[in-house]
Amino acid sequence: MHEESWRTMFPDYTQYQTTLDHYSNLEPASIGTLQPRLSDAVRRFSALNLQPRILRITAPDNTLYRDYIIELIKKYQFNSNNNTTCSQTSEKEQPIIIAGENVTAEKLFGAVYPPLEQNTLAKPSVKHGLLHQAHNGYLILSITALLSNPSLWPRLKRTLTDGVLEWEASNKKVVINLPPAEKLNVKLVIIGDRYLMAELDSAEPDLSTGFAMYGEFEQDLLLNDASLEDYLGYVKAIIDHHQLPQFADSNAVTALLNAGARYAEDQTRLPLCLLWHLNLLSEASLESDGKVITAANIKASLRAKEYRESYLPERAIADIHHGQVLIASDGKEIGQVNGLTVVEMPGHPTAYGEPARISCVVHFGDGDISDVERKVELGGNIHAKGMMIMQAFVATALDLDQALPYSASIVFEQSYSEVDGDSASLAELCALMSALSSQPINQQIAVTGAVDQFGRVQAVGGINEKVEGFYKVCVHRGLTGNQGVILPKTNLSNLCLNDEVIEAIKAKQFHIWAVENVDEAIPLLTDKPFRSENEEDETILSLIEERIDYFHHGDLSNEVGILNKIRICIANWFVQN
């Protein structure tokens, strides 16, 4: 347990400075360089002439990603006649047909129309569909088209499997002579995000049993010397392809890497999202007036995005500033702690962090710890799991011979929407220990982290948003120099805080404490150790044990014993009568 330096609040790229300085000398890199698994899937799919006939690619379904996938297909096209690799420009390039999201049976398969002339010699007219256009090539199909029109799939599956298309009349009520079935050699590529792929899997289990090959567009990359060069070449290719201004210097490249670490929520990874890069670089180009992009331009574009999306977060924080939502940032309270939450609003593009007051009260009872959120059906399953894990740790830590003679209730105060996740279980545990021991908690410190049954503190998501949410409350009321956040040590690699928070930490006006277990967290909040090997030391557990002892052997025990006897007598009287 120790206070973290401001230098750990953001990524450190000094070891890569030589590579950053030589950015301008790097060659643009193709997307396949950073997508080895997807490239291998496309290469093998192109080479196979029999099965599978379908390649599923998990990726955002938009034109930008489709264009890059088509680029990969063209790179690995094979000659179906001799099964040997063609050159980059094949003698006879295989067609690649893109089907839009609005695909009908007629558009996909074609149809047969009745003859215009009403005589027996007239032949019906045939309209070919996208499958015919993709003969001996590839059909790129959006997964949305299949899910929005499920009746397409059985016929499409049969056509791809058999290699034969059976014609159907455009009007089923009109009897016409259909042409003979046609042979088709088409490979289907389905593109869609992971959630839509899951829907398709549930409707067609064969897709996961070898009927289709699988590939995915990876969204991030582990940072090292080799991957950084490839990544910067990838960024350079995006800039060249979309005719954007180049970076002014290595500081601009570092600013991009910092923004990427924040986006990926990991100091050790680089994002590969095409849309994110294109949006950020386009807006940075706007800030630079079409000249070279500087670090200041990138930071300005990030601030502009934050400003556009700041209305809801600012309204939420304003409710705290005006006292409508009660959050303490100074003083001490028993059974109350500042937890940290991430709020996701439907229709809003980004999640934001805000503190939440978690309170716990105890009373005489049978040891039950009541989760109010769960009882009123505002708590999700993961939150309920976190509560039960926390209760198991408390029972183990107290090591009682009999049930705890107190019951407790824990609640997120002024929370009126669903709460889920286990990231508040450390805060809930601290509130419970405070209430049981009657030891107050320092309200200048907020807490986030999940706990396991052994008291170890585990990583949580949205760590940057959580820290910045509590900082906004503190800075509005005035920084005291003692405020800060307790977070899991395993979350340090996820930190990429904004410049204002980093400067406050650097000036010792705001603090970050990283903890590995409950024993490290509770002393920071209560100024007392959680437990000690020396039995004479006053600890949180010893205070709880004294309270339980007083209950069992003090005057309070006699009073409660008499009340229990009266309660039992009344119950027996009702049973007998």
Predicted regions, residues:
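Conserved ASCE/P-loop NTPase catalytic core
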Residues: 1-201, 206, 213-224, 228, ...
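Peripheral, non-AAA+ core regions of ATP-driven protein-machinery
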Residues: 1-27, 40-45, 70, 128-131, ...
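Short, surface-exposed charged micro-motifs
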Residues: 359
